[in-house]
Structures are given as structure tokens and as C-alpha cells.
Amino acid sequence: MAVQTALAQDKLWVRYDNRFQANKAVSIANADSIEVKTNQLKVYLPDEKTTTVALTADKGTIQFTDPGRYLLKPSTYSGTNYENQKATSGYNFAHSLESEHFVVFWDVRYGSNPAKIQYPGDGNVANANTILQVAEKCWKIYVGELGFLEEGKSTTDKYKIQLYVPYQKDWRADASGTNGTNGGFTGIGHFNPWAAVARGGHTIAHEVGHTFQYLVSADLGTDGAGHLDRGWRWGWGGGSDNGWWESCADWQAYQIFPDRQFTDGEYFEQHLEKHHLNLLHDDWRYACCYIQDWWCMKYGRDFIGRMWRETKSGEDPVQTYIRMNKLNQAQFNDELMEGYMRMATWDIDGVRDRAKHRIGQHKKRLKTVNTTQRIYSTEPATCIQNYGYHITNMQRPKAGTVVKAHFKGLTDAEGYHYVNKNRAGWRYAFVALMNDNTRVYGEVKADKEGTAELTIPEDHGTCKNLFFVVMGAPTQHWSHPWTSGKASDTWSQNEEQWPYEVQFEETRPI
């Protein structure tokens, strides 16, 4: 065993080369001297007494600083001999790099340089140091700010999260967690070099986010080996999967790379195309990563983490949100509608400045019924579903103008797919953005047939933008099930649509 220089202290540790072996702490309080042998350590005390501490013959380092976390051998690689330094494929300790909370293993075929993990003939070069830097930033945000884990009460108090770089050119990016070969739980993720460098590190942060989601159940689950009763380890409404993992992982990653949230040319564009769908629709799962900012503004920076930790078996996120915040269905609809109205101008803490160049970019989803009378209606391809929404850019009126929208919710229009007509509901209102960046929010209406209106103020300059916002707001919630590989319309309760017709006064869609 190697021995580090001793400092004046009362304890030393053994850090084994086999990182799956728990570190050993040895008391040297009041010692005059110590003697180290191959498999034992003798501590000599002032009164001529001697304490002998048995050590294993395993290779390791005796050190005077706490080595911190070690590793749990994952069942995923139960047959892998990580101590085999002559391995010609797979993983071993010789091809790994550690930080405080994470370890990166790369396939031995990549070679021994942690800064050049490259598949032959491929231009993507991963760097284990960079991976660890991103991962540690994730730890700081996901634990310290978002509250996914509670230090001192987590499996990560003992075990590092494991990240692997498999030997392949084709895209691979996945993460969650697994059981240890002898019990326990560990977070585990994989990304090949292409994925490791993709999106400026966003993919790493996304996959690391999945390990934290898994570890919620590992820390809090009570149902035995699977720990499937916490942290959304289930589907709902008859499905076996859920897209909330992806929605939150992308949102988590944007907390690490906030400058990408409205500029990366990917998820925001998908969001604009898909947000008429059910909030929990599988087709929207990767791009539904913006409502979380509103919920955190309303209930605190750690609210999404608390949702993951406080959800109960079988609940979907809407049910968890309603229960946690002691709301009824109508109140939930009102809160969600407020968030969507704020999204018209991105009037949300944390994104307000970064998203300002995106104001006015929502898609027009209304077709003209009568130009002269300014009557418009939805179309089946993009009609709102439960908790989906439209934000329509409207012609800007002069200050002092009263704009009106005579709204009619439809439950018998041809070409639409109706589910639970008796639960049909809508929310609708105007939002104005003034020249001095003041936001003016109109009264939200919920009547199947009613009129929303807004007076454009005269004391904030001209009106820069006017929007009409409509949300699908069922009077009673039902879950949207999904199983990977099955189309959403496999379930009869899915693909609900809430069409509407609206006639405007003093403005029109543009």
C-alpha cells in the first residue's frame, strides 16, 4: 500500500484500488507512531499500548484525507472485471476518471488518454474531464437549487454516480439507475462520444438529470428492491411509460446551459409546433420544458424537485401538482392559464430577458371563417387538447381601444375527436405588451360562450404586441397514458380536442 504524508490529525483512511470496495477509516487518536504492513496497521500509543488494525491484502492507498464516496458495482456490469488491466474491450478502473460525485468509465479500446475519447474515423472527441465538469455543475444545481436529492439522506452520500462512454459510433444517450450486484442503488448513464459533445453539453446534463430522477426513488422508495413507488417510476391511465422524465430532463439541462434554452434551434422550435397538445402528450415530451419555469416562479426554485420527491404512486404530474398545492380542478386551470398568458411575452422570472427575442413567434392556428365579420376557428390538425394552448398574434390597436373576442366553445363541430364531452372547458383572454415593456393582462374567461375584452392603456406608450390566448381546460382531469412503441390514439381517452370559434372586434389575427 502507498502511504501519503501524515498530518496532525486523529484519523486516516484506506482508499482501495478496487473502487467497489468501501473505504476504511482507522483511528489514530493520541498515536505516537504508526507502522504499516501488508495487511495490518499498528498504532503505538504513549502508554506503550499498541492497537493492531487488520487490513485486507487488497491494493490501496493509506491517506490522511477522507477519500469520500466510492462506487457500487452495478448489476448492469455484474460480469465485468474492472480490475483486469489487460482487458481488450469493455471497462476497467485503469480507464476511468473521478470527481467528487461522479466517475466516468470509457471503453478500453479508446485508449488511455481521458482527453481524447474518439471512435476511429469519427470526428467527435469526448473528454472525460469535460464530462465531469458538466456533471459536477449538474450536482450543484440539481441538488443545491432544484432539490432533487437531500444530502445526508441519499444513496449518493456513499456512492458516486457512474457515467459510461461505450465504444460505438452510432448515437447512444440514456441514463437512469440500477441495483447494485449486492444490493443498493446507483445512478448510471451512457453516452458515446457523439452524444457526449452534442448540444454544447446539454445532452450530458439531460442524461445526468435522468440519474437524479431515478435516485429520487432510490432515496425515498419504500416498496422493496424496485423502489417503484416514488419519483414517477410508473405510467398512468393504463400506460406503462411517461414522458415527464424527458420534459424535466430537458428543463434541468437548460438550468445548466440557460443561454441555449431559446437559441439552440431545437426544443423551442418543437415547443412552438406542439404546444396545442395535451401537457403530458408523448409527442411533446422532449419540448414540454418551459412550463416548469412558471411553476418555479410561483412556488419556488425547488418546486420541480419537490414534485418528483412528493409524487405518489400512480399519480401523473397534474394530479401531483393539484394535491401538493391544495387546488381544485378549476384553480389548476386558472394557474396554468396564467402561465400560458405569461408565455405570450415570456414574462417569467429567470427567462424574461433571455426569451425577449422570441416574443411574437407563436404559430397562427386559426383559419378564417368570415373576413368581413372577423370570425375565425380552429383546425383539426392543431386544435387544443387538455392543457394545450394557442397564442395568437393580433393586430395592434391604438391606445384607448377596447378589443373584444366573442368566444364560442364547440363540441359538435365536424372533423374533431371528442372525448368526455361533458368535461369540455376552455380559458381565454387577451395580453398586451406596451412600448415601455409593461404587460397588461385581460380578465380570463371560462364560459363556453362569452366575451373577453381588454382596454389598451393610454399611459404606457403604444401597444407593441397584442395576443389572444386560449387553453383547453377540462372541468375534470383524466390522465393521458402512453407506452413506448404504441401510438397515443391506442387509448380511447387520448387525443381529445376542444375546438372553438371566435369573432374579434377592433383587432384580428395576423
Put a short name on every predicted segment.
Residues 9-72:
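Compositionally biased alpha-helical segments
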Residues 70-102, 106-186, 192-208, 212-222, ...:
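Zn2+-dependent metallopeptidase catalytic core
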Residues 186-261, 287:
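Zinc-dependent metallopeptidase catalytic helix centered on the HExxH motif
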Residues 314-510:
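Beta/coil-rich, acidic/histidine-enriched accessory regions frequently appended to metallopeptidases
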